[in-house]
Swiss-Prot record:
Protein family (similarity comment): Belongs to the acetyltransferase family. YpeA subfamily.
Alphabetic keyword roster: Acyltransferase, Transferase
HAMAP family in the record: Acetyltransf_YpeA
Transmembrane segments: none
GO molecular function, one term: acyltransferase activity, transferring groups other than amino-acyl groups
Pfam family, one: Acetyltransf_1
CDD domains: NAT_SF
Enzyme class: transferase
Protein name: Acetyltransferase ECA0875
Length: 141
């Protein structure tokens, strides 16, 4: 397995991966999300590759105060092999190198498998409510 920075020719493979991992929502345009990411810290957008096939991804961010992780997904046929852990670990190292003191992420409440994975990586549930507001409407995916 190789973990590397997303390349432009990964576009379709990553969107297909996200579809397989059920990461997409009708109100998020994945193409637009990728384009936006490529304009901000593109080196924090990582993919995992096995035999030339993209089998995992994570999209990281850092705003100078905290890091973030989005679109963490591993192809169902490759789960349980440490790929998600490797992606998060690489992202954490990149954030630490920037002086990032902490990372926050969001997981759907009913996603027990992913919550358990993060807990094994020493992530803790933080007692807060996440609020959001759409500032720009994306086209429906």
């Amino acid at each position: 397995m190789e973990i590397r920075i997303f390349r432009q020719d990964d576009f379709e493979a990553v969107i297909t991966l996200w579809e397989r991992c059920d990461l997409l929502r009708p109100w998020n345009d994945p193409e637009m999300d990728i384009e936006r990411k490529l304009n901000h810290d593109p080196d924090l957008f990582l993919v995992a590759e096995v035999n030339g096939e993209i089998v995992g991804s994570v999209m990281g961010g850092y705003d100078g105060h905290r890091g973030s992780a989005y679109y963490l997904g591993v192809h169902p046929d490759f789960r349980g092999r440490g790929i998600a852990n490797a992606l998060i670990s690489r992202l954490e190292k990149k954030l630490i190198a920037r002086g990032c003191p902490k990372i926050h992420l969001m997981v759907r409440e009913d996603n027990d498998a992913v919550i358990g994975m993060y807990e094994k990586l020493e992530y803790e549930t933080v007692d807060c409510i996440t609020l959001g507001k759409r500032l720009i409407e994306d086209r429906e995916y």
